[in-house]
């Protein structure tokens, strides 16, 4: 649908956020509402946001929605969603009925990647790999400012691939993948998500820190935090080396809570060449530009080609 204004929706586990952009990507309004953690409440909350933005713009706006899961092209059924009440539901169809318009739906990691590719940290690069490091560990691929979904719609979704070149300690880990849909051994998410990182630290040192507190300890020169962040950086370099070997992006852009750790952008690039079949790696490792707004902006940009 053609519209001068674009609405982006970020469907989170406890809150649903919306943004209204003009045709140049300027933010006109942004709102966030809590909702009851069930299917109907989620649809009602999205409708509330869309109705409010339509009123502000005085137009029937295009709507893009980022979800923590995947929507089948064949059936429209949601799978592998962390918000479990979405699974096995025809969410796109039901949302279109509620909003009385076509809706574009995409995985939230892809929305983040698209946002940074269109007018974020990756706007000057042709090929982008975007990574979200937060509660989970997801990824997305973009080429020429368009998302590459792949035949199975999981291109770049590397969170549940096995950690490459595992050390003996990693092979002996007793921490399971935090995702409800996984359970595989050596799953990358159990090592790389914010939850996985702090769980490994706390189990090893018999502590009860959050990931943010561990990062603060590192800034205070705590040797435990420095060691564990160093191990984390090495794991990230191994994973990035695999992606570089397959997709060879111009830039890798980090998002999510752990993307705010400044040392990553110095240390990880220097480690990647150890694991690539190349003496020099030109791929840039960058921090996102849009911060917490990136995913919801990317959802709005799902209508960028219209």
Predicted feature residues:
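A short acidic/small-residue loop/turn micro-motif
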Residues: 34-37, 86, 154-157
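A charged helix-plus-loop insertion that forms the helical arch/lid used to bind
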Residues: 76-87
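Short loop/edge segments at beta-strand edges and connector loops
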Residues: 105-109
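Glycine-rich phosphate-binding loop of actin/hexokinase-like ATP-binding domains
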Residues: 125-187
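A cytosolic small-molecule/anion-sensing beta-strand core signal
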Residues: 67, 74, 143-144
